[in-house]
Regions:
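Bacterial Sec-dependent N-terminal signal peptides
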Residues: 1-25, 498
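Subset of outer-membrane beta-barrel
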Residues: 21-498
């Protein structure tokens, strides 16, 4: 039983919210192009005439409870240690509820953007098409007593730590949700104001959503008591429970390729839509000042378009996924006494859980479909050009489960300061970030020609004793910049000094 509960704890950690921004270092920079369409759809004004994605992937996990020893990260033999938990895992005990996140996003090949406009306003409009494979899993609001009891396993050791036996316990708003989906988006952005030193650009993305897999569970008020080490009472607790039809289980589809194919054919749920909206203001105090003396030098497009301060706001992923409910996934009321969970066994995975629910609890009739809301978030940034090619970006990602039923996916509210150096074919970005779960990260992203690679946190690799979060992102693109604007014969650009 202790081993099963340890696996449960490991699942909570792996599925638990993180610093879940993808490509954090590129947020706010105009050089991100199509990569930033997931941060703000206001992409007009980019230095790139055309930006085509070959492949881009971002993955991260994070939790605020169990840390992995940095030693184990670099020594695979540690994972075969019979005392792995004691030697290489570390609990963060602070009395707070435990949460975590796992996320993956892949921007599909040939996602692209291009800009067009009059000769003297070549970046007036931008159009993009992009598609992404997405996966997010959240576990939220696990009380420290429940988390530690699961981590140490029912019995003397856990009780000696948490004193869970013969104690009236509760857990409010406990939730777990997970979804995989594909989105196909068309983006339009335009510079709507361009007067002297002031520029305002806006953008929007309309997305078609393809649900692949989804599940959630939510307990508003869990009330329970352990009368013995492995004997449980649960008191009149309402549980919302759903997973999509065809979920991989002995009662559904055990053929993974067939299951994925079913999802891609909209058999797991109908298509729905979502929208992104964004705006960026730029202040260019030098826009009306002559900046070229009597010469015939060509002017780089990005030199003409440089701003001193930019500020942006976007609301992303406003929409929801709809799934066909599995036949055995129903809301239920748990009200049971003296349940010997030590003898509980789940040999058939999800089917065994369903069988237990059907036999022990009062199951309620369910609707044919259930909803999982997308991770709606608010992105804000202020970007300041310090000097020439050196800038610093202040960004906030605000995301939380705002649904009363706790069926909304979410990222983790994170605040970042990102110093950077960038020119057309190279950029170095150093994000310093802190999230609401108390995790601090110092990362590095490099952009070298068409290649982007980085991580949100290098501290875990070189400084931190234990890792609570990990992130990696990489991309390969085809960038086509604007050609230089050069004077023609008889068109000599000059201005007087002063």
């Amino acid at each position: 039983m202790a081993n099963r509960l340890l696996l449960l704890a490991a699942f909570l950690v792996a599925a638990l919210p993180s610093q879940a921004q993808f490509f954090t270092g590129l947020r706010g920079t105009p050089y991100a192009g199509i990569t930033n369409v997931n941060y703000s759809p206001a992409i007009a004004g980019s230095p790139w005439m055309v930006d085509i994605n070959v492949i881009a992937i971002g993955a991260n996990v994070n939790n605020n409870y169990v840390g992995l020893s940095r030693y184990a990260l670099f020594h695979s033999s540690a994972f075969s240690d019979t005392n792995f938990q004691q030697n290489y895992l570390h609990e963060r005990v602070n009395g707070l509820a435990k949460s975590g996140y796992a996320g993956l996003q892949v921007q599909g090949p040939l996602s692209f953007m291009f800009q067009f406009g009059p000769k003297n306003k070549r970046t007036l409009n931008a159009i993009a098409f992009s598609y992404h494979g997405n996966f997010i899993s959240n576990v939220d609001n696990v009380t420290e007593v429940l988390a530690r009891t699961a981590y140490h396993g029912l019995g003397y050791d856990a009780n000696n730590i948490t004193h869970y036996v013969n104690t009236e316990l509760s857990n409010a708003n406990l939730s777990i949700k997970s979804a995989a989906w594909i989105d196909y988006g068309i983006t339009y952005s335009r510079v709507v104001i361009n007067r002297r030193e002031n520029q305002l650009k806006v953008g929007g993305t309309l997305k078609l959503l393809q649900p692949v897999s989804g599940a959630y569970g939510y307990v508003k008020n869990l009330s329970y008591k352990w009368t013995e080490y492995e004997q449980l009472n649960i008191y009149n607790t309402q549980v919302n429970y759903a997973y999509n039809n065809g979920m991989i289980t002995s009662q559904g589809n055990s053929d993974i390729p067939a299951y994925v194919k079913q999802g891609l054919q909209f058999k797991n749920g109908p298509p729905t839509v979502a929208v992104d909206l964004g705006a960026v203001y730029e202040w260019r105090p030098d826009a009306t000042k002559p900046n070229h003396e009597m010469d015939c030098k060509c002017i780089e497009a990005e030199q003409v378009q440089r701003y001193k301060i930019a500020a942006g706001f976007a609301i992303m992923d406003f929409g929801a996924l709809r799934f066909k409910r599995g036949d055995y996934s129903r809301n239920f009321t748990a009200d049971i006494r003296n349940w010997d969970v030590g003898g509980a066994d789940f040999p058939d995975g999800l089917q065994s859980i369903d069988d237990t629910i059907q036999s022990r609890f009062k199951v309620q009739p369910g609707k044919k479909y259930f909803t999982v809301w997308l991770p709606t978030r608010f992105n804000l940034f202020v970007d300041y050009n310090i000097w020439k090619d050196f800038s610093v970006n202040f960004t906030a990602l605000i995301s939380q489960d705002m649904s009363p039923k706790r069926d909304m996916l979410h990222q983790v509210t994170t605040f970042s300061v990102i110093p950077r150096y960038e020119i057309k074919w190279f950029g170095a970005y150093v994000p310093l970030s802190v999230d609401v779960m108390g995790n601090v990260g110092l990362g590095l992203t490099l952009r070298a020609g068409p290649l982007i690679i980085g991580t949100q946190d290098l501290l875990g690799l070189f400084v931190k004793k234990h890792l609570y979060n990990a992130d990696i992102h990489a991309g390969l693109k085809i960038n086509i910049p604007y050609h230089r604007t050069c004077p023609k014969n008889g068109d000599i650009r000059f201005s007087k000094k002063g």
